[in-house]
Amino acid sequence: MTVGIVGLGLIGGSFAKAYHAAGATVLAYNRSRSVLDFAMMSGAVDGELTQDNVSACDLVLIALYPEATVDWFRRMAAHIGPHPVVVDCGGTKRTICAACFPIAQAHGVTFLGGHPMAGTQFSGFKNAKADLFHGAPMVIVPPDFDDVLLFDRVKQLLKPAGFARFSFTTAQAHDEMIAFTSQMAHVVSNAYIKSPTAAQHKGFSAGSYKDMTRVAWLSPEMWAELFLENKDNLLHELDIFMAHLGEYRDAMQRDDLPTLTRLLDEGR
């Protein structure tokens, strides 16, 4: 198998290491040449992915920010051809799929939206791990839901990464869910850590503090773009969250033990 990786950050780098460990030939593109050179020197990448060899890939994984994903695919679509399956790995799906599905159709390319549900609070190729996706879910957004053979092919192509299960959904449904399951956690954690009290936490914090703050350490550029790409869904979830916080605050302000107890019980 020959796999093309576009972007060698945490996600793309982990895919490169996973497929290399599985015996695949890995070709990669990265905006920073020094990262690509390091990846080749470390053995995770066998060569550079270019417009001349992209059509020879069985699978192409795009691990860039949403806007960069669309730009790369628009620029390369004419060179990809009918053989490779192209899957993007961005954190939101509506903007990417709305732009890339028509481009793919115009050039006879097989393109699917994707979102590997795995990661860490760290970024960059230096933190990439071959087992990052082991046991993780993979969300796939196809252009239509009639091609069962394509679904099976995608599963087989992604099997070396170690995903435990696959979910096939629409871009709209994906973005609605991801606002709650991922983006909310990041924005709430990031806001929580801004309390002046956080500077004095040592000696007074344990597991709950660690759990609450882990994802506050994020890439500001990437997450800002993802939040704005999905702002309608994220703002909806934030409004619900802030309304519930207000209920807790009001109950405490009134010394209302029964109401506070009920609220805490409902949230378990």
Positions of PLM-derived features:
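Short beta->alpha hinge that forms the Motif I/post-I loop of the SAM-binding pocket
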Residues: 31, 64, 89
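Residues at the starts of beta-strands that form the adenosine-phosphate
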Residues: 2, 25, 110, 137, ...
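N-terminal Rossmann-like NAD(P) cofactor-binding module of classical short-chain dehydrogenase/reductase
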Residues: 60-61, 87
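Rossmann-like NAD(P)(H) cofactor-binding subdomain of soluble oxidoreductases
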Residues: 74-126
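NAD(P)+-binding Rossmann beta1-loop-alpha1 motif at the extreme N-terminus of oxidoreductases
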Residues: 1-51, 55
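Internal alpha-helical scaffold of NAD(P)-dependent oxidoreductase catalytic cores
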Residues: 130-217
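Interdomain hinge/lid region at the active-site interface
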Residues: 200-268
